[in-house]
Amino acid sequence: MYYPEPIARLIESFSKLPGIGQKTATRLAFYTIGMEDQDVNEFAKNLLSAKRDLRFCSICGNLTESDPCAICTDPTRDRTTILVVEESKDVLAMEKIREYRGLYHVLHGTISPMNGISPDEINVKSLITRLMDSEVKEVIIATNATSDGEATAMYLARMIKPAGIKVTRLAHGLAVGSDIEYADEVTLSKAVENRLEI
């Protein structure tokens, strides 16, 4: 189907977003065109601001406006526990349940032999360094229940256990192949409560 070039480019831009197919991208493009100029400008400004103003925390790797992030600098957090997640969105999901009061570490991905992603290509080295220089007694591995998530969890357990640090894994309620981001708060709460040592 033919669209004027500005619409075609907008559709193409929307279709690059995860989970957005051609049909949804087209719908979003036409919706955006119908928006008031002020709303479009605010949307564009917010996109640019998020891209420009956010950075990764130098301690945990979470997205933040200030470095170190608010979680790492919060004196009320339990500094003896670190919960390891794949992405920053997983930190948000865990914070929603309000059960976990420790620190986090964001890997920015998983080990994936099939995709050629090795431990050196995710945020593992800084975790190991962090563990050697801290009072951490337990690392909770909260990678997704996928083959890559499991491979990453096993690798991390092998790296961390020799240091005498307890390594646990989220438990009950997370189906194999599921993403933490999409789990409901009760399921996540139970998974943290019933974590298993690995």
UniProtKB/Swiss-Prot annotation:
SMART domains (alphabetical): TOPRIM (SM00493)
GO biological process: one example: DNA repair
Keyword field contains Zinc-finger: yes
Family: Belongs to the RecR family.
Domain Toprim: 80-175
Functional note: May play a role in DNA repair. It seems to be involved in an RecBC-independent recombinational process of DNA repair. It may act with RecF and RecO.
PANTHER family according to UniProt: RECOMBINATION PROTEIN RECR
Protein's name in the database: Recombination protein RecR
Keyword vocabulary terms for this entry: DNA damage, DNA recombination, DNA repair, Metal-binding, Zinc, Zinc-finger
Gene Ontology MF term list: DNA binding; zinc ion binding
Record flagged with keyword Phosphoprotein: no
Zinc finger (C4-type): 57-72
A Pfam family of this chain: Toprim_4
Gene behind this protein: recR
